[in-house]
């Protein structure tokens, strides 16, 4: 299972693992500022931010798994096989194929807030890159130093969620992932309080007491 995560302390970190048992010969790919991106329905963008990430490069097109642009905005696509639904081209929308979404967002946006604005009129289309490379069912996490969002294209349309957990994995949709965290709210690095039989010692307590006697 793949997982994306952001960490912000004094510095800011974003990363993901690619938990697959096979390889598409992915490699580190750097796209300079004026390298042309030819979008299926939105023309060509030759004036964009530079970006670096892991990609499967086909016919000069980096099919990014994840990337970070020169402004510090990062984005990763993770598997979303049971829930992802892409749509036909829609009028009055920016129609972007799933394999185009990372360069489309990172090429234009400096921040999560700008990405939110751009996503308001976005439609993710059913287009595959080629007959041999059909569209992958994905959802995306977008991150900067100030915040984090998740983008999911489903049967009822495009959803953009603030992601306060700063983590995203594959299925289910993000609201259910956040709900599932409630099952683990009792976990702690501290020893639990013994409310069942206070006269009994936990194993670790007994070991500590034995060491103090020695």
Regions found by a protein language model. Give the residues of each.
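Long, His/Glu/Asp-enriched segments that create or flank divalent metal/ion-associated functional microenvironments
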Residues: 171-194
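Function-determining sites in protein domains
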Residues: 111-113, 188-195, 199-201
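Secretory/export targeting leaders with adjacent low-complexity proregions
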Residues: 118-131, 139-140
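Conserved small/polar residues in nucleotide/adenosyl-binding loops
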Residues: 202-210
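Compact, glycine/acidic-enriched structural inserts
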Residues: 36, 89-123
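A contiguous strand-loop segment
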Residues: 1-93, 126
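Extended amphipathic alpha-helical segments with heptad-repeat/coiled-coil character used for oligomerization
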Residues: 134-175
């Amino acid at each position: 299972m793949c997982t994306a995560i952001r960490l912000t302390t004094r510095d800011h970190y974003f990363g993901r693992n690619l938990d697959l048992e096979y390889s598409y010969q992915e490699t580190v790919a750097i796209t300079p500022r004026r390298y042309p991106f030819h979008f299926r329905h939105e023309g060509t963008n030759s004036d964009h931010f530079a970006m670096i990430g892991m990609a499967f490069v086909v016919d000069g097109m980096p099919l990014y798994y994840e990337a970070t642009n020169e402004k510090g905005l990062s984005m990763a696509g993770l598997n979303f096989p049971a829930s992802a639904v892409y749509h036909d081209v829609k009028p009055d929308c920016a129609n972007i194929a799933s394999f185009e979404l990372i360069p489309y967002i990172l090429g234009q946006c400096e921040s999560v807030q700008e990405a939110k604005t751009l996503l308001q009129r976005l439609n993710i289309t059913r287009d595959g890159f080629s007959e041999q490379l059909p569209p992958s069912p994905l959802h995306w996490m977008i991150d900067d130093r100030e915040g984090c969002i998740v983008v999911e294209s489903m049967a009822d349309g495009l959803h953009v969620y603030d992601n306060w957990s700063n983590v995203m994995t594959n299925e289910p949709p993000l609201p259910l992932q956040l709900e599932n965290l409630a099952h683990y709210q009792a976990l702690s690095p501290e020893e639990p309080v013994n409310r069942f039989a206070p006269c009994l010692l936990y194993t670790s307590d007994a070991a500590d007491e034995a060491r103090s006697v020695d």
